[in-house]
């Protein structure tokens, strides 16, 4: 049996018994839902009060991942912002791998990726940066409190590519 990271003891041995968990019954010719004729207008945001730079790097030999040269420490606040303000975050991937950058609590707009304007305005919580790319994000800080930002690849996050944002 393959080593499954400690899970082997909890898994049944022998042939599996498939079980039906759900029956889904749908009409043969479903009616399409109507789409709105126009999208909701996008709110006008105040001018950004600060531009921050976050640099994503990695040390593959040590299997460590960094933001601004540091691995995650839950006791450290990496960024401090003010509620009801808007910031620009420039997130640069100096590593050799793609990194999907994720921010909790505060949806953002992608202004550009790789120097090219983003093709449409939308609220996002993840933007993927290929090796060498820079993403410019417009980040409204609406809620007070602590939250995190990190690479959305769990192995990268667990090995250090995460930081703490505190909004006061």
Regions found by a protein language model. Give the residues of each.
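Extended terminal and domain-junction accessory segments
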Residues: 1-98, 140-146, 150-168
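Extracytoplasmic beta-sandwich strand-turn segments characteristic of Greek-key/jelly-roll folds
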Residues: 48, 68-81, 105-144
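Short, hydrophobic/aromatic beta-strand segments
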Residues: 99-103
